[in-house]
């Protein structure tokens, strides 16, 4: 019987684990026990070997099936650890594929060899800019011009960065590859890694005589006026994307994009919820009691609305298609009008008397408020 630990136990996974789960567990443990992170720790080194052995078997469907049926003994002669290639008979290439992104961080560049390539022209960066518009402009749209400070191709050197009459040279440090290779000793032998060449910034070319206008960058800053079409129905905080209006790209690479963030001012009368708007309409208690035809403000101007008699405060009525236009489609939201019945704070004697008569007609006894001493004195002087 084999004395090796169960491979599933080594990786801390169940026997029914999917391939992605196996890979995730392996990467986590390998990062933890890697010898470069545990220098001089023999136990960590052995653990690391055990983890790789387990993964080498469980990541291979054929070997995993054999292992599940016959255990460790069933793998004898199949090129497991100690077989050809050093690591599971796959050579170092498979190990590199698995750990390229991990060891790339450890060694400061690409892991392995033969994959380094010079950096290609980079797309321009995106620009983010804000505009502020009114509530009505958000509702019905607006065409506007904005000024954007962005990079433009240098007119002096046509974007090359080199002084007119000169050209870029092949980088002597990396011989035009854009990458510098290094070899480091590890417990597993020499490992080649590559990193972007610092002399040419990974481009493979250097400028010996920089352009005096752009100082070798190939671009200059300019303020550009751009026309923006604000669509009807846009809401506060939404963005408009203008493709190809961002920073200039390198060596003819595409420009970045311009993102316009729209800020919408609040309205003194209306509030917005989606494509609907809300408005509170004050009316007198007489209008509420007897009913009346009133004029209601809308985004399109005032419209007439008949308030039915007996309308209570808090009553909400709807004006169809008087809200915000929908960005996609030809329809609009609605306007909801909430009635607020205003009660007068001061009434003259005649108005009070009329209300008392009204109360009597309704069978409601309204007790007259007792006058204060000061009010009685005031009434005495009025009689004189």
UniProtKB/Swiss-Prot annotation:
Name this protein carries in UniProt: Chaperone protein DnaJ
PANTHER family tied to this protein: CHAPERONE PROTEIN DNAJ, DNAJ HOMOLOG 1, MITOCHONDRIAL-RELATED
InterPro entries with a match to the protein in the record: DnaJ, DnaJ_C, DnaJ_domain, DnaJ_domain_CS, HSP40/DnaJ_pept-bd, HSP_DnaJ_Cys-rich_dom, HSP_DnaJ_Cys-rich_dom_sf, J_dom_sf
Superkingdom, natural source: Bacteria
Role, per record: Participates actively in the response to hyperosmotic and heat shock by preventing the aggregation of stress-denatured proteins and by disaggregating proteins, also in an autonomous, DnaK-independent fashion. Unfolded proteins bind initially to DnaJ; upon interaction with the DnaJ-bound protein, DnaK hydrolyzes its bound ATP, resulting in the formation of a stable complex. GrpE releases ADP from DnaK; ATP binding to DnaK triggers the release of the substrate protein, thus completing the reaction cycle.
Similarity annotation: Belongs to the DnaJ family.
Annotated source species: Clostridioides difficile (strain 630)
Entry domain remark: The J domain is necessary and sufficient to stimulate DnaK ATPase activity. Zinc center 1 plays an important role in the autonomous, DnaK-independent chaperone activity of DnaJ. Zinc center 2 is essential for interaction with DnaK and for DnaJ activity.
Gene3D superfamilies: 6.20.20.10, DnaJ domain (1.10.287.110), Urease metallochaperone UreE, N-terminal domain (2.60.260.20)
Co-factor binding details: Binds 2 Zn(2+) ions per monomer.
Compartments in which it is found: Cytoplasm
Gene: dnaJ
Molecular function terms, GO-annotated: ATP binding; heat shock protein binding; unfolded protein binding; zinc ion binding
Occurrences of domain J (ranges): 6-71
Mapped zinc finger ranges (CR-type): 141-223
Alphabetically ordered keywords of this record: Chaperone, Cytoplasm, DNA replication, Metal-binding, Repeat, Stress response, Zinc, Zinc-finger
Protein residues bound to Zn(2+) 2: 171, 174, 197, 200
Alphabetized SMART domains for the sequence: DnaJ (SM00271)
Binding residue positions for Zn(2+) 1: 154, 157, 211, 214
């Amino acid at each position: 019987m084999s004395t090796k630990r169960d491979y599933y136990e080594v990786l801390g996974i169940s026997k029914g684990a999917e391939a992605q789960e196996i890979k995730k567990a392996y990467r986590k443990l390998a990062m933890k026990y890697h010898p470069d992170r545990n220098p001089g720790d023999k136990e960590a080194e052995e653990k690391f070997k055990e983890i790789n052995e387990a993964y080498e078997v469980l990541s291979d469907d054929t070997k995993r099936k054999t292992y599940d049926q016959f255990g460790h003994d069933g793998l004898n002669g199949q090129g497991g650890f100690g077989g050809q290639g050093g690591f599971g008979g796959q050579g170092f290439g498979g190990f590199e594929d698995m750990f390229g992104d991990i060891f790339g961080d450890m060694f400061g560049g690409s892991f392995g060899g033969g994959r380094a390539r010079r950096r290609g022209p980079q797309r321009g960066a995106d620009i983010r800019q804000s505009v502020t518009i009114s509530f009505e402009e958000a509702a019905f749209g607006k065409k506007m011009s904005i000024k954007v400070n962005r990079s433009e191709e240098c007119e002096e050197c046509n974007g090359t960065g080199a002084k007119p009459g000169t050209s870029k040279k092949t980088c002597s440090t990396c011989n035009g590859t854009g990458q510098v290779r290094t070899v480091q000793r590890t417990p597993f032998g020499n490992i080649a890694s590559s990193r972007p060449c610092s002399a040419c910034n990974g481009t493979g070319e250097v400028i010996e005589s920089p352009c005096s206008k752009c100082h070798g960058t190939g671009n200059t800053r300019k303020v550009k006026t751009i026309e923006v079409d604000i669509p009807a129905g846009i809401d506060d905080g939404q963005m408009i994307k203008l493709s190809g209006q961002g920073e200039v790209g390198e060596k003819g690479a595409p420009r970045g994009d311009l993102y316009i963030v729209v800020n919408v001012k609040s309205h003194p009368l209306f509030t917005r919820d989606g494509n609907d708007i809300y408005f509170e309409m004050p009316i007198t208690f007489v209008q509420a009691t007897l009913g009346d035809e009133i004029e209601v403000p809308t985004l399109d101007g005032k419209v007439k609305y008949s308030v039915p008699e007996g309308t209570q405060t808090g009553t909400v009525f709807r004006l169809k298609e008087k809200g915000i236009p929908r960005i996609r489609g030809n329809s609009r939201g609605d306007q909801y009008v909430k009635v607020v019945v205003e009660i007068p704070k001061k009434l003259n004697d005649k108005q009070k008397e009329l209300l008392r008569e009204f109360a009597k007609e309704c069978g409601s006894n309204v007790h007259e408020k007792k006058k204060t001493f000061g009010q009685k004195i005031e009434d005495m002087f009025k009689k004189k």
